[in-house]
Amino acid sequence: RISNLYQSIYNGNPWLEVNLADTLKNVTAEQAYKKANPNLNTIWEIVNHLIQWRRNFLLRMQGETIVTPDHNYFVPVLDPSEAAWEQSLQTLAKSQDSWTAFFENFNDEDLAKIYVNNGHTYYEHIHGIIQHDVYHLGQIVILKKLV
């Protein structure tokens, strides 16, 4: 069930009526790169942030100890081309494929396991990455209207 929830947020029909794939589908590199406000992240920066946090959490779920960098995976985009934007979108899609593969072999008993670095259960981590995606999906929806 939790895997279906995570999948729906990426490209399904979640209760919030928007998903990441559809929201990003018609966003151009120019729009993704544009700063709506100097104090806000761009759509592209948020997408790259999501990719890195999805990777971070998946590695945690596979038993690796991960240290989050000080920049918290918010880094400026250096190549604003359409090709680079498409690469980011493909990397996001691949991250979803990785999570789908993970869930196929995941044992529900492992939900109670504790991640040693922060004392939270795997259950909390999975819900955390879902909440994280939804939080930033909301930001992307708003930024899309501003750019």
Outline where the language-model segments fall:
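Short, contiguous alpha-helical
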Residues: 3-17, 21-24, 29-74, 114-147
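Acidic/histidine-rich alpha-helical segments that form the ligand environment
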Residues: 78-113, 124
